Amino acid sequence: MKKRIGSFLFFALGGAFVFAQEAPASGPTAWQFNAHANFYFIPDDFFILPVFQADKNKLHLEARYNYEDRETFSAWIGYNFQGGNKLEYTITPMLGGVVGRSDGMAPGLEVTLNFKGFELYSEGEVYLDFQTEENHYLYNWSDLTYSPKDWLWFGISAQRTRVYQTALDIQRGVLIGAGLKNWELTTYVYNLGFEDPFVLVSISKQF
C-alpha cells in the first residue's frame, strides 16, 4: 500500500513539475504553485498534513496526505471560477481520488471570498468510501480572517475531520498569521476552554 501511495504521489507531482518546466516563467498562462505543511500538535499525538496545489488558468490540481485519514493520499482536479470587483471570489469545484488506509472518491469545493480586508476561505468535501457507506464523511475547514496589513491577518477557524479525535465534532479556534515575500506562517489554537485544546502551525510558500 505504501508503494502504491508513493508511486501515485511521484507521478502526480512529477507531472506538475514537467508542465511547470514547459510553461513560461511569467504571464497569465504560467503555472502557479502553493505548498503547505500543516503541523498538528495534539495532546499525546503529532502529525504533519502536507498539501500541494498547482493552478494554470482555470485548471486546478491538488495533492493531500493525512487529510481524509492517516497514511492516506488524495489527488484532485478542479476548475477555477474567478471574478468580482469589490467582492473578489475564487470558487473551485473539484473531484478527488483517495488511496491508503481509506480508499474512495470525493467531490469537493474550495471557496475564497475577499472584501475590504476580510477573507472567508472554506474547503469541503464529501468522502465516499468504496468499502462501506458507514465510512462516508463530510469534511470541512473554514477560516474567517481580517488583514489590517497585507502581511498580517487574524481571525477564527473551524474544522470537521476524522484524522484526530477530540470531545468535539467540530474543532473551533482562533488564528494569527504573517507573511514575508512568498512565505506565510499561521498559528491556530483550537478548543480553548474545552477538554482537548491543541495547536496547529501552518507554513506555506507560493512559487
Predicted regions and their residues:
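N-terminal carbohydrate-binding/catalytic regions of secreted carbohydrate-active enzymes
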Residues: 62-63
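Glycine/small-residue-rich loop that forms an oxyanion/phosphate-binding "nest" at active or ligand-binding sites
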Residues: 73-97
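N-terminal Sec/ER secretory leader and immediately downstream segment
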Residues: 46-51
